């Protein structure tokens, strides 16, 4: 889907609004979204004005089910590398993976200062230590309302509520005007900590004049308001009461410091010890305690190795694995491969998270495994064990009403969510000609006079597989998909380099296709087909080895399909002597 302007005819009355404060009207600002549009994750946006650039966020997205063997997907950094001399800094809205997960890969190409709140910098620093980059990177800790000067940009962080502490929006001022990028946000009037979203500052910018708003679209299809985190505390407290004589195991996001603190507080109320399982959970909670974002009373925290020394009713285990990750602690518990934890009928398990789209099957598999072991399992939809960290429609309307932008760009969502958010904006009187549903790689040019699209820039998905970054492309994925569906047949033969005659073999090896011992007639027939194809090449004086391999592959493929209605990958290996 290309970038879309004028989403539909608008019959809504235009609201009276204060005029934009005069700026240098001839000066445009360019916005280049490199990720986060048409997808949930991989958020990355570049702003350019007067020869200066800043980057907001640098996240990853986890692979689709058909991306076999791929660990994660990151943005294509070609454009920022080409413009590295213009970049004044990397600003981060908050510490979730879809906003910070690609930073190590970017820093392997560029040396950039990172601007983030205290907790956000702590989470990034932990991540960079795994790559040996933490000591080489300049961190600048920021606080809400503290303005930053980066080239021609003046940036003010604005406190917002989210499912992680220290989340901010950014008001980005330039000679072209002021742009507000919300990051992930919701409006929670009774948050657990840090206070409500700073509506006053957002309103101040709306009064001064906002050129454009880039706003979180994740929950654009959900009416009403997002529930408060206090609701989760009440729901989990009632479940603690139900599990009086059982060990409690709770899976949640390791980055959800609020949720983990809630669990600790409830455990203390119930007289239970707390243990953590999962590397990211252990690392994040240790870092949160060190920075003062988490408080665990003395004597409450125990090692995972100590949990079996206490009666089950005196233990709460907080673990990773709420998204069904195959190697997570909860997954290992479900498969009986966790070193310290054996799940059984005495366990009460709460999955305090909603599956990210695409993870539903993985989560269901873990739930089934835990139930088969005799545990009682509670998950999202059964009780109030999770609330979203993203704004629903009424909060999105409030953000639009407070900031009163001239132009609106919905971001952070799949196309259907961006579209719905655009319709919501139009319902508030923003002219549809001033609303743009863009795509990754768009070159959005804004000024006081107009919004237009320039020449697109390089943007896309770079796949990370182990230590390989970008070496897995569509051809490799197609081969992996082929292998996963019908398997592989390898043909090995030794041939005379001068005559082409077969000196040894051909031998056939099957992997993921058929079990050879139970299909000897099929494999004998396949061997005969290969011998015939090689003999014909000799008779017809075919000496080009690529042509010989193609003939062998086509002959064998046709035979196998006739016999099995399957099409395995066929790999001929001819050794010349």
What are these regions, as identified by a protein language model?
Residues 2-7:
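Short, small-residue-biased leader/transition segments that mark boundaries at the very start
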Residues 128, 425, 560:
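Conserved hydrophobic residues forming the short capping helix/wall of the S-adenosyl-L-methionine
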Residues 152, 167-169, 314, 486-490, ...:
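Broad gene-expression machinery/nucleic-acid interaction feature
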Residues 222-352, 356-525, 529-541, 549, ...:
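Hard-cation-handling environments
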Residues 541-577:
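C-terminal tails and terminal domains of large nucleic-acid-associated
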């Amino acid at each position: 889907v290309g970038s879309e302007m004028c989403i539909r005819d608008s019959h809504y009355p235009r609201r009276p609004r204060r005029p934009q404060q005069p700026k240098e009207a001839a000066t445009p600002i360019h916005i280049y979204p490199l990720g986060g549009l048409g997808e949930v994750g991989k958020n990355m946006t570049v702003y350019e004005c007067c020869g200066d650039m800043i980057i907001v966020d640098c996240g990853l997205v986890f692979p689709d089910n058909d991306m076999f063997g791929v660990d994660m997907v990151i943005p294509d950094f070609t454009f920022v590398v080409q413009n590295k001399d213009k970049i004044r800094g990397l600003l981060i809205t908050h510490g979730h993976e879809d906003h910070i997960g690609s930073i190590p890969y970017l820093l392997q190409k560029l040396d950039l200062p990172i601007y983030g709140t205290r907790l956000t910098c702590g989470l990034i620093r932990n991540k960079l230590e795994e790559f040996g980059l933490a000591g080489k990177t300049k961190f600048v800790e920021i606080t809400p309302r503290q303005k930053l000067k980066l080239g021609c940009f003046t940036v003010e962080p604005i406190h917002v509520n989210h499912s992680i502490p220290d989340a901010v929006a950014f008001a980005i001022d330039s000679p072209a005007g002021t742009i507000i990028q919300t990051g992930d946000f919701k409006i929670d009037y009774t948050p657990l900590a840090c206070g409500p979203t700073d509506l006053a500052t957002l309103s101040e910018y709306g009064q001064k004049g906002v050129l454009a708003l880039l706003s979180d679209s994740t929950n654009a299809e959900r009416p009403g308001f997002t529930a408060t985190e206090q609701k989760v505390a009440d729901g989990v407290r009632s479940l603690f009461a139900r599990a009086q004589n059982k060990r409690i195991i709770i899976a949640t996001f390791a980055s959800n410091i609020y949720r983990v603190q809630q669990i600790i507080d409830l455990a203390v109320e119930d007289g239970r010890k707390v243990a953590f399982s999962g590397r990211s959970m252990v690392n994040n909670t240790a870092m949160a305690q060190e920075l003062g974002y988490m408080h665990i009373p003395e004597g409450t925290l125990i090692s995972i190795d100590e949990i079996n020394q206490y009666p089950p009713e005196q233990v709460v285990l907080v673990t990773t694995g709420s998204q069904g990750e195959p190697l997570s602690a909860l997954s290992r518990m479900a498969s009986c491969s966790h070193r310290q934890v054996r799940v059984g009928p005495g366990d009460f398990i709460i999955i305090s998270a909603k599956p990210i789209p695409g993870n539903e099957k993985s989560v269901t598999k873990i739930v089934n495994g835990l139930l088969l072991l005799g545990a009682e399992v509670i998950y999202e939809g059964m009780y109030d064990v999770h609330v979203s960290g993203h704004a629903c429609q009424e909060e999105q309307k409030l953000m639009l009403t407070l900031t009163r932008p001239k132009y609106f760009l919905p971001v952070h969502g799949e196309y259907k969510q961006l579209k719905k958010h655009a319709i919501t904006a139009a319902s508030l009187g923003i002219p549809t000609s001033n609303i743009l549903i863009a795509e990754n790689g768009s070159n959005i040019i804004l000024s006081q006079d107009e919004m237009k699209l320039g020449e697109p820039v390089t943007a896309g998905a770079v796949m990370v597989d182990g230590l390989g970054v970008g070496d897995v492309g569509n051809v490799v994925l197609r081969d992996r998909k082929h292998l996963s569906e019908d398997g592989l047949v390898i043909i090995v033969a030794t041939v005379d380099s001068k005559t082409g005659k077969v000196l040894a073999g051909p031998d056939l090896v099957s992997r993921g296709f058929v079990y050879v011992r139970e299909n000897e007639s099929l494999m004998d027939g396949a061997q005969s087909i290969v011998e015939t194809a090689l003999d014909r090449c000799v008779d017809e004086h075919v000496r080009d080895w690529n042509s010989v391999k193609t003939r062998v592959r086509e002959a064998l493929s046709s035979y196998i399909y006739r016999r099995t209605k399957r099409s395995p990958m066929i790999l001929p290996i001819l050794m010349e002597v």
